[in-house]
Amino acid sequence: SECLVGSEMCIRDRAVTTIVSTDMAAPVAKKYGVELRRTLTGFKFIGEQIGKLEAEGRADRYIFGFEESYGYLSGAHVRDKDGVNATLLVCEAAAWYAQQGKTLLDAIEALYKEFGYYRNALCSFAFEGESGMHTMQNLMKNLRANAPAEIAGYKVESAVDYDTDGTGLPRANVLEYHLAGGHKLMIRPSGTEPKIKVYLSAVGESEAAADAVNAALSKAAAEIMKV
């Protein structure tokens, strides 16, 4: 984060990520005064945000975009993930920290100590056969009708239904549960395959603590999916 923005930070610079990407981006962006926008899953939506800034004559205010499935882009030169750009960013960061006698591992550990150990995981549940899609539809319908009060022992403090809640994003068949402790679980059926993806996000004072939360959330997700 320090390497990317450093002394070049300007008020209302914008970073963009997706709703299923790490929540660690929010406190980092807040520290540096960066506006963080979240989009639906898919780098094309990040590209749309660049286009909106360009239409406002503010394309230079876009500084970075990323998604959980390893897509990165700094600068507004393209509207898609850029592997070469990402590689150069890693090299630049490694060199920047090396000048301070640090490694990239030192840098990420410092971020964890400052903001908390954020750990993400993805569970995928298949619903095969002719009845698979129907089963998925019923499962999502039941979750909307009977919202859980707790998941894995963590109270559901708030829930977002991206299909109905007026999030400012295009409607999507996604349910998001914010849990006590800053943890999160999201449920998103695939639009092309008979499977449901469950995204887990945990934060703790150590890597082991966050991983333990995700392990509990994973078991709870399997129970919800009845797998």
Task: Identify the residue ranges that each predicted region occupies.
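Single conserved hydrophobic/aromatic residue that forms the stacking wall/gate
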Residues: 1-6, 10-11
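Phosphate-binding and adjacent anionic-ligand microenvironments
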Residues: 12-188, 195-199, 206-213, 218-227
